[in-house]
């Protein structure tokens, strides 16, 4: 049910490369958010339980409608990790296997990179 594992692994490696190219430091821990969704809340809940057993923090599910008006439920499975292809590929494989077992969609992962160099002057809107 999830995207093809090879596509997910390629996307993961490309994401790591892009983050590093943008200045992300590989030795820091980042909050990695893996995205899962299903139209069947019970199946999504089963995936959440399995991911918690594997050590992931699972957010409450959000409900949304797709462009066709179909109702979906989604959550993020969160963990801290370095921007390391081996670590992240292991997570992708693990989560994709759980998603397939539970018949839910896994769409890969993302993270936020905070720019510590931003200060109050950078955020000034020009009004004084």
Swiss-Prot record:
One of its GO terms (cellular component) is cytoplasm. It comes from the Bacteria. It is found in: Cytoplasm. Gene3D superfamilies: RraB-like. It holds the Pfam family RraB. Keywords: Cytoplasm. Its main location: cytoplasm. SUPFAM superfamilies: Hypothetical protein VC0424. GO terms for molecular function: endoribonuclease inhibitor activity; enzyme binding. InterPro entries: RraB, RraB-like_sf, RraB_dom. Signal peptide: none annotated. Belongs to the RraB family. Globally modulates RNA abundance by binding to RNase E (Rne) and regulating its endonucleolytic activity. Can modulate Rne action in a substrate-dependent manner by altering the composition of the degradosome. Interacts with the C-terminal region of Rne. This is Regulator of ribonuclease activity B. It comes from Idiomarina loihiensis (strain ATCC BAA-735 / DSM 15497 / L2-TR).
């Amino acid at each position: 049910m999830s995207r093809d594992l090879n596509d997910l692994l390629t996307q993961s490696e490309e994401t790591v490369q892009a983050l590093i190219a943008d200045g992300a430091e590989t030795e820091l821990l980042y909050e990695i958010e893996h995205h899962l969704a299903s139209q069947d809340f019970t199946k999504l809940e089963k995936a959440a339980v399995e991911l918690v057993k594997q050590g992931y923090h699972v957010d409450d599910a959000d409900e949304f409608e797709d462009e066709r008006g179909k109702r979906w439920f989604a959550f993020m499975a969160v963990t801290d990790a370095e921007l390391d292809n081996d670590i992240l590929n292991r997570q992708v494989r693990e989560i994709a296997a759980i998603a397939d077992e539970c018949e839910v969609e896994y769409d890969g992962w993302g993270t936020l990179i905070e720019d510590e160099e931003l200060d109050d002057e950078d955020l000034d809107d020009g009004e004084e």
